[in-house]
Every structure is written in structure tokens, then in C-alpha cells.
């Protein structure tokens, strides 16, 4: 049986669907791991339901057709990651909608898939070693839950310490990855300490010109209010490097994914 449906490399692979297209394929293992939950996709920290997504198979593609047409062009710029001084750097993205369930997170996950594919194939074509973690997905809400877990009063050490280690590991991965998704940065209920850490991640990525896909429930012009920015400097720097896209339509949250 062909393994093509499980592999994000399939649409670019001449062996896809043939006799050599198995779970023992070296490129499949490098991308997805021997068990299908590892490799570079696993290292990206994508939630399990989003790990096989690309722009081609994304369930949000139909409802957000105009955005996806633009994204089909956008992901072609990922080849610039191999240029030392590209004339036009790869832009970051800011995806937002007022309501939930319009496909922002699904789309962001699909874009990570596209980046991993292009990084892996492009590295091989140039006789380079692909990075073990070229891209990283930070679920800001889940990250905040970890923060709360080790900052509550009287939390037992055996609970607080693993949560703290996981929290700071995710923070470092989100800073260091050449490409990252910061999912749902418009969190409204937070503490000064958590907000400071989120600012640190965003500021590090912006300062170092790292490609970032932000998803949010507020437009970029309103993000400063949500993040309680006293000066517009950080938001202005995000805007300078970002393409902003608004997702429209009704929520599909809770419906079975295609």
C-alpha cells in the first residue's frame, strides 16, 4: 500500500504512489519519523490533527479561496531562505478574524507544512543538512496554561517543575526556529509575567528578522491594546514585516474536518 496520503512530501515526490512509497522511505522518516509522529513535523510541535496539512489539502481552502490563492504565491518565496542576502526577504503573515473557527490555525499549520517541505527538499538539492527543527508551532493558549500551572500558589514541585521546564523549552524553540507560528496571540486575560514572556518571543523574532505567522482574533491595528503596549514601536515593527489577511465566514469549529 502506498504511503503517499500520509506524507507531506508526496505532491513533490516522483516516487509517490509507487512501490517505494512506504513508511520505510528515508525522506518520510526524516519528515514524519518512523512512527509517523516524529521527524521534522513532530519537532514542529504541531497538534496531531494538523500534522499532515499543506495548502493543497487544507480543509479551509474552499471557504478562504481568495486567501489561499495569495498563499499559493506566498509559499513560493520560501526558496529565498537559501539566499544569503535576498533582494526581498520572506514576509511574515498576520492572520485574523473576529470570530473563531474560520480556519486561521488550520491555515497556519498548512503553511508550516509548506515551509518544512521546501526546507527539506531545498536542503537536499543544495547538498545541505536540513535543520532538525526548521519550524515551530507555539499554541499561545496552551503555553499560558503551562505558565499558570507552575505559578499557582502552593503547587507541588512534582507538578510545577515539569510544567516550568516544558514552558521554557517551548519559549526557546519559538524564539530560535527560522519559521514559527504564534497561534492566538490575542489572549486577553493574562498576567504581567506571561505577557512579558510573550513580548520577549515576538520582539526576538522581529529583531532578528525571523519569519513568523501570527494568528489572532483582533486586527493588527488593535493588537497593541490587547498586548497592553504603551508605545506603538513593537506593533509598528510587526506591521513593517507582515502581510495581513482577514478570514471571513461562519465558524466551522466542532464540525468534522474534511
Q: Model segments located where?
A:
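Short helix/loop segment immediately N-terminal to the Walker
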Residues: 78-91, 123-129
Amino acid at each position: 500500500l502506498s504511503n503517499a496520503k500520509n506524507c507531506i512530501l508526496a505532491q513533490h515526490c516522483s516516487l509517490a504512489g509507487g512501490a517505494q512509497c512506504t513508511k520505510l522511505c528515508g525522506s518520510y522518516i526524516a519528515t514524519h519519523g518512523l512512527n509517523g509522529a516524529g521527524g521534522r513535523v513532530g519537532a514542529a510541535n504541531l497538534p496531531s490533527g494538523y500534522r499532515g496539512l499543506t495548502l493543497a489539502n487544507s480543509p479551509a481552502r474552499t471557504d478562504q479561496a481568495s486567501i489561499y490563492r495569495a498563499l499559493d504565491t506566498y509559499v513560493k518565496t520560501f526558496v529565498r531562505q537559501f539566499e544569503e542576502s535576498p533582494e526581498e526577504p520572506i514576509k511574515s503573515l498576520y492572520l485574523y478574524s473576529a470570530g473563531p473557527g474560520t480556519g486561521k490555525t488550520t491555515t497556519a499549520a498548512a503553511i508550516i507544512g509548506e515551509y518544512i517541505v521546501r526546507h527539506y527538499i531545498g536542503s537536499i538539492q543544495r547538498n545541505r543538512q536540513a535543520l532538525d527543527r526548521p519550524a515551530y508551532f507555539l499554541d499561545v493558549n496552551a503555553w499560558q496554561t503551562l505558565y499558570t500551572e507552575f505559578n499557582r500558589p502552593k503547587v507541588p514541585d512534582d507538578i510545577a517543575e515539569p510544567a516550568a521546564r516544558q514552558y521554557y523549552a517551548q519559549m526557546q524553540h519559538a524564539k530560535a526556529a527560522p519559521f514559527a507560528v504564534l497561534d492566538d496571540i490575542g489572549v486577553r486575560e493574562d498576567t504581567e509575567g506571561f505577557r512579558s514572556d510573550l513580548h520577549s518571543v515576538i520582539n526576538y523574532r522581529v529583531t532578528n528578522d525571523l519569519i513568523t505567522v501570527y494568528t489572532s482574533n483582533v486586527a493588527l491595528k488593535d493588537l497593541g491594546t490587547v498586548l497592553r503596549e504603551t508605545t506603538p514601536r513593537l506593533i509598528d515593527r510587526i506591521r513593517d514585516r507582515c502581510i495581513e489577511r482577514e478570514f471571513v465566514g461562519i465558524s466551522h469549529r466542532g464540525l468534522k474536518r474534511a
